């Protein structure tokens, strides 16, 4: 059984980020139901590292449900540099949000994890049972461990108080409103920004690394639909991986080619192999998702890349970069 419909007041933390904006769009485009009141907040509304501010926000909104997206995030190179900062800031945010949600009587919290939480040394495909089987990749251990702790905390809230606090594990998310910063962003938005600059200046495109690592990319608007389904229908405390299938994994080289094609770039493409590749692959199984939603249709990768590139070009001045 899903949540009884109606009488849902849903607070979305991190509402101005990539996934928050996607949920906002999907809700506005008709996915919201009568009786659902959606409240999207960002760091402008409260500093979630501060317990008193977080509690005041939750007291004010009085949500029945929370989608917790707020986090200090960054790409591979920023993670390598600031493992402690990622750990400390996020541990405060997560504890403040989860405990304030508990204190105001929220019926359900859905938090957002990441596939980087999985053990570095593992078998593939990875699934939801493997989260705590070994240490994560050393490059971003601070962020990885702090995200794992949400799963630990969810289980503890359930054991001690019977709370339905759960989490989703998306693979590599991309789409409109992403962070397109070349130094600090994730791989795909970074590539989009680089291609835009190379095209504008007539220079070559340099892709960091060998281009060989493989990733499962999920379009933010697809993820938004799945988040809403989890909020209404998924009642396990165990996390669920939200991902395209294993066969839809693409190499960084293929991702770069999709961006080059979408942006009609005709310059030279080179790979800077002095830059780190990070994990070679982190192939995730979406079989648990498919047992619940066998017919869910993901946006084809090239179409999603095309839409994201078009959004970035149209919103270049305002885009995070």
UniProtKB/Swiss-Prot annotation:
Substrate binds at residues 194, 208, 215, 277. The keyword ATP-binding does not apply. Belongs to the NAD(P)-dependent epimerase/dehydratase family. Fucose synthase subfamily. The keyword Membrane does not apply. The gene is GFUS. The record marks 147 as: Lowers pKa of active site Tyr. Keywords: Isomerase, Multifunctional enzyme, NADP, Oxidoreductase. Pathway: Nucleotide-sugar biosynthesis; GDP-L-fucose biosynthesis via de novo pathway; GDP-L-fucose from GDP-alpha-D-mannose: step 2/2. GO terms for molecular function: GDP-L-fucose synthase activity; isomerase activity. This is GDP-L-fucose synthase.
């Amino acid at each position: 059984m899903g949540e009884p419909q109606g009488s849902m007041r849903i607070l979305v933390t991190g509402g101005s980020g990539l996934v928050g904006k996607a949920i906002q769009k999907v809700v506005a485009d008709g996915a919201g139901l009568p009786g659902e009141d959606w409240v999207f907040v960002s760091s402008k509304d409260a500093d979630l590292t501060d317990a008193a501010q977080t509690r005041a926000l939750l007291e004010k909104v009085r949500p029945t449900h929370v989608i917790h997206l707020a986090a200090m995030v960054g790409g591979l190179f920023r993670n390598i540099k600031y493992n402690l900062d990622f750990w400390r800031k996020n541990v405060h945010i997560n504890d403040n949000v989860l405990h304030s949600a508990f204190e105001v009587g929220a019926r359900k919290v859905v938090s957002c994890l990441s596939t980087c939480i999985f053990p570095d040394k593992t078998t593939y495909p990875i699934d939801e049972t493997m989260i705590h089987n070994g240490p994560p990749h050393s490059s971003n251990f601070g962020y990885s461990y702090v995200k794992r702790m949400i799963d630990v905390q969810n289980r503890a809230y359930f054991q001690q108080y019977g709370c339905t606090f759960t989490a989703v594990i998306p693979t590599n998310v991309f789409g409109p409103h992403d962070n397109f910063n070349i130094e600090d962003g994730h791989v795909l938005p970074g590539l989009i920004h680089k291609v835009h600059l190379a095209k504008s200046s007539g220079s070559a495109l340099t892709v960091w690394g060998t281009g060989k690592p493989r990733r499962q990319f999920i379009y933010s608007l697809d993820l938004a639909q799945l988040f809403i389904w989890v909020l209404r229908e998924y009642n396990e405390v165990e996390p669920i991986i939200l991902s395209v299938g294993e066969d839809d994994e693409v190499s960084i080289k293929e991702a770069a080619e999709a961006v080059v094609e979408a942006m009609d770039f005709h310059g030279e493409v080179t790979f800077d192999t002095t830059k780190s590749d990070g994990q070679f692959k982190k192939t995730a199984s979406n079989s648990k998702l498919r047992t619940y939603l066998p017919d869910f249709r993901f946006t084809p990768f090239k179409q999603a890349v095309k839409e994201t590139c078009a959004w970035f070009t149209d919103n270049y001045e305002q885009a995070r970069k």
